[in-house]
Amino acid sequence: MRLIQTLSSCLCTGIIALFTACSQAPQSPIDSVNPFIGTGFHGHTYPGATAPYGAVQLSPDTRKGNWDACSGYHYSDSTLMGFSHTHLSGTGCIDLGDILFRPSLQTPLAFSHSDEKASPGYYSVNLREAGVLAELTTTPHVGIHLSLIHISE
C-alpha cells in the first residue's frame, strides 16, 4: 500500500513538473492589446499612440468629411493624408479641427497594413513609396513624431 502511495505521488509530481516546463512565459497585459479593433466598419476608433487620459492622441488620418471619417482613420483605406494630435475614439461624429502633419509632399501617401505597428502609446507605419518611416509615441502630456526620411541620390 505504501508503495502505491509513493508511486502515485511521484507520478503526480512528474505530471505537474511536465506541464510547468511546457508552459509559455507569462505575457504582459499590454501584449494582449490590439489597437486596430474598431477601426473598420462603423467602430470610429483609431490605432494611434495615446496614454490613458492623455492630452494628445497621435494617429494617422486616412480620410475626412464623411461619417466613416469620425476618428480620422478607417481600416479599409490604403492611403493616408498625414498625422494629427487629437482624436476621439468611438464618437460617431466629426468633432475635432485637427492640424495635419505631413512627413512628405506627396498626398495621399500609400501604405500597407502589414507595414503598420501599434501598441499602447506607440504607432508606426512604413510609407515605402514616399521613403518615410513614421513613428508616433506619447506620454500623458506630450506627443512625439519621428519621421525617418530615406533620401535617394
Language-model segments: residues:
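C-terminal motif of bacterial Sec signal peptides marking the signal peptidase cleavage site
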Residues: 20-21
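Compositionally biased regions
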Residues: 9-11, 24, 153
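The feature marks either
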Residues: 17
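Bacterial N-terminal signal peptides that target proteins for export
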Residues: 1-11
